[in-house]
């Protein structure tokens, strides 16, 4: 049996993605600008189909003068959320991510994206009213995922620890988790998130659950 020629060039083909202006986006092994986070292109495509970041961006009031805006709320929100989905949790990570061509393409820009300080200011714009509107987006997305009214819904309330490694506001020690942490309350229906409520860890795990359940049931009954 003849031995394979290991020096022979093999055409591995390529994957073409949607263009961004004049930028051609291809998935191949011999390209020019490279990225280790090419999966963000698929994430961006799914998000555009769902319209999740579009809806979330409309929930955040922009206090800046329109004449001085370089990075819009939607592009910054996409940049931050996509980064989290890729495992880049720290704002400092965006010192490099802002120049990543795959991230830029997924977000829908062809220039350098927002810096870490700019993203930090975006996060500080959020208040309780913003959080309320963002949760409405989650519930609306959940409702829109059903073509017909479900016969039954099971809401799963889960309090879990979010460990802290600094002197954050609301930092307390939790004996069960044996660490300083927050104790956020999550509400899921299947694999879909309906609520993520940040709380300090010095409270009972069920605190606020009844009030959140009442609000969710009221909204779901309005639809079904």
Question: Language-model segments: what does each one mean?
Answer:
Residues 1-179, 183-204, 208-223:
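Dynamic "connector" segments at or just before major functional cores
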């Amino acid at each position: 049996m003849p031995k394979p020629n290991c020096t022979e060039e093999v055409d591995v083909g390529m994957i073409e993605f949607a263009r961004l202006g004049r930028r051609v986006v291809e998935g191949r092994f011999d390209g020019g600008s490279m990225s280790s986070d090419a999966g963000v292109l698929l994430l961006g495509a799914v998000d555009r189909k769902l319209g999740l970041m579009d809806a979330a961006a409309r929930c955040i009031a922009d206090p800046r003068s329109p004449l001085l805006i370089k990075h819009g709320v939607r592009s910054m929100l996409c940049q931050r959320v996509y980064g989290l989905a890729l495992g880049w949790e720290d704002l400092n990570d965006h010192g490099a991510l802002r120049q990543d061509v795959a991230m830029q393409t997924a977000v829908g820009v062809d220039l350098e994206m927002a810096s870490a300080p700019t993203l930090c200011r975006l996060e500080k714009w959020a208040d309780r009213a913003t959080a309320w509107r963002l949760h409405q987006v989650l519930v609306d997305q959940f409702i829109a995922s059903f073509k017909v009214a479900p016969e039954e819904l099971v809401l799963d309330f889960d309090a879990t620890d979010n460990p802290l490694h600094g002197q954050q506001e609301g930092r307390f020690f939790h004996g069960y988790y044996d660490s300083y942490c927050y104790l956020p309350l999550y509400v899921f229906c299947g694999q879909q998130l309906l609520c993520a409520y940040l709380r300090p860890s010095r409270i009972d795990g069920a605190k606020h659950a009844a009030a959140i359940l009442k609000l969710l049931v009221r909204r779901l009954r309005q639809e079904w």
